[in-house]
Design a protein with these regions (language model features):
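Membrane-interface capping segments at transmembrane-helix boundaries
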Residues: 227-238
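Transmembrane helix-loop junctions at the membrane interface of multipass transporters and ion channels
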Residues: 49-58, 191-207
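Hydrophobic alpha-helical segments of multi-pass membrane transport proteins
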Residues: 147-166, 182-190, 221-228
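Small-residue-rich transmembrane alpha-helices that serve as helix-helix interface/gating elements
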Residues: 148, 207-221
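Multi-pass alpha-helical transmembrane bundle typical of ion/small-solute transporters
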Residues: 181, 211-214, 238
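Hydrophobic alpha-helical transmembrane segments in multi-pass integral membrane proteins
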Residues: 120-124, 185-199
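Cytoplasmic-side transmembrane-helix entry/capping segments in multi-pass membrane proteins
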Residues: 171-179
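Membrane-embedded transport module
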Residues: 1-166
Length: 238
């Protein structure tokens, strides 16, 4: 036993296949979480750097960032950890011991989605056209509430991008009910914060039109990533 690489405790060779399957599932879940976290962090970093140059020193307040970090560090990690072990994982080639955990597919998703999310955020903040959809007030409270909602909902939609390499973002999603429940809860809490967060979260209730503008802009991260996946699929990478 001491010199063995694998010890079968139940004298059943199927246990080896199960161990490999669950090991690969955990490995993939870690990768999904890394994609999600680095994408959101990339966007947040760009905003923190660019914000002061466009006249908005704090696009995201400290309290809002605490809520964002709770989603990224705790709830998202929990959601991805419940990804189901799929039999198709056993058909993949073995991973090398020295293989990097971040591959080319992940780099492109982090870079493209992160940069695109940053572009959407900056466009929102700088565009007079977008601002014209929001009620006018001295402190831009409705406009900045919309930006907070935009940032969160882009993260929620991007979670669906990160959880699968397939074009169909809902592929096998029914096997991870925790993912569905957690992101539904995050969406509900976010809606509550928009309308009842008040001065603590710097949020004030959006009108239906304002909310639809925010959701439509946030949703665009999905077709952008689907297009990226189509390019990879055409090249035979996925």
């Amino acid at each position: 036993k001491e010199s063995s690489d694998i010890v079968i405790m139940d004298n059943n060779l199927i246990s080896i296949a199960n161990a490999v399957l669950y090991g690969r599932t955990i490995f993939k879940s870690i990768r999904k979480f890394i994609i999600y976290q680095l994408t959101v962090n990339c966007c947040a970093l760009v905003l923190s750097f660019v914000g002061p140059f466009i006249g908005i020193p704090t696009p995201i307040t400290v309290i809002q960032m605490l809520w964002i970090n709770m989603i990224m560090d705790t709830l998202a990690g929990l959601a991805f950890s419940y990804e189901a072990p799929l039999k198709e994982y056993l058909k993949e080639k073995p991973k090398k011991r020295n293989q990097s955990i971040i591959n080319k597919f992940m780099y492109t998703e982090i870079l493209i989605t992160g940069v695109y999310s940053s572009f959407v955020s900056i466009f929102y903040l700088c565009s007079p056209y977008i601002k014209s959809f929001f009620r006018v007030d001295r402190d831009n409270i409705y406009f900045m509430t919309g930006f907070f909602a935009l940032f969160i909902f882009m993260g929620i939609f991007n979670a669906f991008n990160a959880r699968t390499t397939r074009i169909n973002l809902l592929s096998n999603i029914s096997k991870n009910k925790v993912f569905i429940i957690l992101f539904m809860c995050i969406s509900i809490v976010q809606m509550y914060l928009i309308y009842f967060g008040g001065s603590l979260f710097r949020t004030y209730g959006l009108s239906f039109k304002e909310l639809m503008i925010v959701l439509a802009m946030a949703f665009t991260v999905i077709p952008v990533d689907i297009f990226r996946k189509l390019l990879f699929k055409r090249r035979g990478v996925i």
